[in-house]
Amino acid sequence: MDKEKRIITVLMILTIVFTIMGGTLAYWSWRTTDAQKTNITFTITSDFSCSADGGGDITSGSINLVPTVVNDKTTANYIKRAVKVTPTINTTGKTIYMDLWLDIKTLGTGLSNTDYFRYSFTTGSSSPEDGVVYSGNFRGLVANNRVRLLLDKEYTSSMTDTYYLWIWLDAAETDSDTMNQSFHLVLNGSCTDTKIEPNAPVLDDGLIPIVFDTSNGTVIKTVSSTDSSWYDYSNQEWANAILVKESGTQTRAYYKANPGVTVNESDILAYYVWIPRYRYKIWTTGTSSQGKEQTIDIQFESTDSISTGTTVGSYITHPAFWWDNDSDGVRDSGEELAGIWVGKFETTGTASSPTILPNVSSLRSQKVSAQFTTAQLLGGTTYGVSSSSDSHMMKNSEWGAATYLSHSKYGVNREVYINNSGYNTYTGRSGGNVGGSTPINKTYTDQTSTTQYNSYGYYTWDGYLLNYNTNTKSSARYLNRVASTTGNITGIYDMSGGSLEYVMGNYNDTISNSGFTSMPDGKYYDKYTTTSELTACNGGVCYGHGLTETNAWYGDDALFVSAVYPWFFRGGVYNNGSNAGVFDRYNRNGNANNNLGFRSSLVVDGA
């Protein structure tokens, strides 16, 4: 075992099973299962160990979980558990990092479709607001998802920390769908002595780092590339950057030279999000992944390191971080990427003047060859991008890189909410939940329709509820309902629903109706040499592409390319319901269609 990169599973402490009883007053009663071990320590070496104590079995009888405020007078109506965490460090100077989470074994759909079934993990014991570490609700979560409690908690000496886990149904809950439900949660965790920070984003001359201020509306501000507020992947805050007009309300040079100034949205041409280089732990080499959704174990990696695992439990560098610059199929020196920039939204604008913007219709009805050409335009001088950088249509492996990161502890780590904006497919829109769980009458309670989408979607990219079936914002805002890969405004949008997105993934150089006269250079597309998912990449599994490894996760469509339909598209469309999602994959002949859009990526010289 590589002692410098070992990860040690440390906890399997407390299983709490809740059984629904139902009733006019009591929504739930709960009871323990058989006796559980509640304090387990795993020690791999003599250097350190970690343990946690969940407080013993639940044996105190029933608690009636009813809609409630949480205070000293309502203790019979909510769950509160003390959790003691004890790292033991036996080597002077050793630093370790602990993660703690709740594994969801089962969760009723009524509990997954409300904002009011809530949790909080705190350092204080007086209330769920007393020293919050993490808090939220279970909206959009299903079995095999995790609820984050601690992430990379740093310890430099032996100690015992006490935290408090709160679970309750908020007093604002009025929906009867939360009755007659059940859930099963397991406290779990891991510990490591290695923490690798993500590679710093590599900026092209035209890319300007930004942050989002959502305290009063949505204000986009420039930020220094060395400012710690730019990104924090451990807190699911991904790095964003923009391309701007050379001369708009302000000049490009002004924005580049002045960190902290507000950017006029009319000056923005494109938004990008940085996906830092990483390796991930292989969890399967077969095709039977359906129903086996899990947190993807990701470790950030420097360009000096290439991981080449091929067996379950080993690590492999994600293939999107090799840019085969000379298209010779050989991994040459200088071709390892520190990361890639991915379009934050589906490509917008026109074929001759593309943009990447929110709240506008995506660019559709192009053949793959035309999409490929349009994506390259975003790398031109009009956008301020240097000729040494490479703007291109997103490859299938690059789609995989973004989705794998989203389903790790650094992303939303659940199914991404759907963009349910119909027909014109406005970018960045959200149904406020996962596909299949967005009926109109649940969001707009004065409506009776159970249709899962409308013309404009329900929420904007920055969380504003739209007035029903209009393109105008209401004053109501729900930042936790955005449809991004992080669950917040810093992530990538439109990867579930919206338009179907062609990607540069092709069966055996089969052009079909794509419009190409010959295939582009090999660095621009992923070539699948067979129609078997187990042998399509150099005779083996296509690691990292979001194919066999994530086959039919969350019930997403799972078709492979063929001689008749040789081009992949991803994500599903706005009206696919539960079949849409970031792991959705389908095939087509490369022709144009009003539902088919695409996404642009950018490889920066020096990355």
Question: How should these model regions be labeled?
Answer:
Residues 3-4, 64-73, 128-169:
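Extracellular adhesion/glycan-binding regions together with long Ser/Thr-
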